[in-house]
């Protein structure tokens, strides 16, 4: 399965809620060198494969070969591997896409179901949706999260006046994370925008730049 959508739409929260339904291993990728990313990845896998993080893996191929050999097989339901923010890993190690393709195509890896998630629309497109993409046509489920509609904002922020709802939606859009931040602010909409966005110390002051960097 592949889940994509711009930053702050709630992909990680959705994955965490979903993973509670059955055996699952969540790996949240971060930026860094290829070696540090593999080490962190292996540490996360140790939650399912004890001792997995105690080994140094020189390549992604060796890591996934070891993973396939040790991944649980005896449960009534397969243990799912969730890789969140996959583009961080592929940006550092372009070969990882082909390694994942090999895992999906290899019958010996059928007991390792994958859920891949990412915020970079350009990179997720290149990994999964382009006809030349390594993983093209291999996902059984494709989910693209969209911003929430304006009809959801009033109840979420306890706003009743239609004009106030429209103004708030113009400021925060349909992004759940922004709504949560706005709900914790004192004062009116302008006070919240000033505190969160316009202030140099505001949580969202550099948000536009961060979103654009995701697509570099």
Regions of interest found by a model, annotated:
Residues 1-216:
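Phosphate-binding site recognition
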């Amino acid at each position: 399965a592949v889940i994509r959508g711009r930053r702050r739409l709630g992909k990680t929260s959705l994955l965490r809620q979903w993973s509670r339904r059955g055996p699952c291993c969540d790996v949240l990728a971060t930026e860094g060198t290829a070696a540090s990313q593999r080490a962190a990845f292996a540490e996360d896998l140790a939650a399912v494969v004890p001792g997995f993080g105690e080994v140094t893996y020189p390549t992604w191929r060796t890591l996934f070969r070891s993973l396939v050999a040790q991944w649980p097989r005896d449960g009534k339901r397969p243990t799912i591997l969730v890789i969140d923010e996959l583009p961080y890993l592929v940006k550092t190690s372009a070969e990882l896409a082909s390694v994942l393709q090999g895992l999906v195509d290899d019958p010996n890896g059928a007991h390792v179901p994958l859920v891949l998630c990412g915020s970079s629309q350009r990179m997720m497109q290149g990994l999964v949706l382009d006809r030349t993409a390594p993983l093209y046509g291999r996902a059984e489920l494709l989910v693209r999260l969209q911003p929430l509609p304006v009809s959801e904002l009033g109840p979420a922020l306890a706003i009743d006046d239609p004009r106030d709802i429209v103004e708030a939606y113009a400021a925060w859009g349909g992004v759940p994370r922004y709504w949560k931040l706005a709900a914790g602010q004192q004062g009116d909409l302008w006070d919240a925008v000033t505190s969160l966005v316009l202030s140099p110390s505001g949580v969202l002051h550099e948000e536009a730049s961060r979103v654009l960097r995701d697509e570099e």
